[in-house]
Amino acid sequence: MALLFGIGYVLIIFEESLSFSKSGIALLMAVSLWVVRSIETSVEIVTLELQHATSEVSQIVFYMLGAMTIVEIIDAHQGFKLVTDCITSRKPKILLWVIGFATFFLSSVLDNLTSTIVMVSLLRRLIPPSEYRKLLGAVVVIAANAGGAWTPIGDVTTTMLWIHGHISTFSTIKNLFLPSAISLVVPLALMSLTSEVHGMGLNTPPTPLLAYDRSAPRGKLVFGVGFGALLFVPLFKSLTGLPPYMGILLGLGVIWILTDVIHYGDLERQHLKLPHALSRIDSQGALFFLGILLSMSSLDAAGILKVIANYLDAHIANVELIASIIGVVSAIIDNVPLVAATMGMYDLSTFPQDSEFWQLISFCAGTGGSMLITGSAAGVIFMSMEKVNFFWYFRKVSGFAFAGFTAGIMTYLAVHNFPL
């Protein structure tokens, strides 16, 4: 099973070179692994294991689909114009910091992918094609990953840990906000000294802001209700004790009815209604997560992940080092299966909820992907939108991202071990 998983994983890593869809590979890998598992063990046992795995995995997939649909309907109503309208500075250094922290806070309540799309689209309105715009785009990637690490709804990996009870809302925000902010501040400070930014104000005249399109009808209302629905999910979980996907489905139902009422009887606004938004969400991404998580659950059921955990415990006793290694590896390998594997390797009896280990896993897996452009969904979409290649990012940005990653870990350990 480990060999089969390894082959599938290599195919996923080189999906662009092979022109294969990683979603298709992940689904084939998941089914193949469970078939092998059924051959090794009785069908009755495997059926129970698969039912348990499907129950856990489906919660994450339902949550993702609900959140992506809400974000898509907000975007269709140009709700993010409220955010982009607030960014008016044209001074290079100020814009660098404004873009960074706007993305940081936006990503804390949205997924990294959507935050990156919104902010890179904004950059296209602010700045003509240049090295400076590429650098700002890289800032968006770092900020999106850092912003997603300190809230349960900001990144799919923190959401996975949260849904499975490894981290809680208040403790995550309290313990990871400062390290996440530091992991952004350090790269911003270093980038401010580069020639692309420092020399920009000396040699280039201010870039005029481009006009925005007029907002869709009731855009502010949809923005408020949609954002409120996303923010309500942690409160819903704490009030009812029900899993987060129920909260996101509640919000989805509310915004569905709202948009039906707003656009009732208007045939020219069908593209603003939720059924059309469902056709635009990243369903391939959801199926990829489904395949990966089912694959990891098969390895967990077979006891393979426990063997790896025992090996790490025997050779690397330091939990901080294990979490840091996972963060570095997440720059090369997708962080979703890494976190899924970690949850399978270590249960809550080994490391209880909100322990240092799970907090560090949340931080490291979230921010580690910034070190390479292919290490996160934010980096991949930036590469696609701005036609940035792997080696440009590696030369210009990876060092800054690594410095921020290291500083963030040191900040967490300092605060955790020496509380004020």
UniProtKB/Swiss-Prot annotation:
Major localization class: membrane
Lipid bilayer topology: Multi-pass membrane protein
GO MF, any single term: antiporter activity
Single Gene Ontology BP annotation: sodium ion transport
Localization annotation: Membrane
Disulfide bonds: none
Any one GO cellular component localisation term in the record: membrane
Chain segments annotated as transmembrane: 25-45, 60-80, 94-114, 136-156, 173-193, 221-241, 242-262, 285-305, 321-341, 363-383, 400-420
Organism of derivation: Arabidopsis thaliana (Mouse-ear cress)
Entry keyword annotation includes Transmembrane: yes
Superkingdom in the source lineage: Eukaryota
Record family assignment: Belongs to the NhaD Na(+)/H(+) (TC 2.A.62) antiporter family.
PANTHER family: SODIUM/PROTON ANTIPORTER 1-RELATED (PTHR43269), SODIUM_PROTON ANTIPORTER 1-RELATED (PTHR43269:SF2)
Alphabetically ordered keywords of this record: Antiport, Ion transport, Membrane, Sodium, Sodium transport, Transmembrane, Transmembrane helix, Transport
The protein's role, per its UniProt record: Na(+)/H(+) antiporter that extrudes sodium in exchange for external protons.
Protein's UniProt name: Sodium/proton antiporter 2
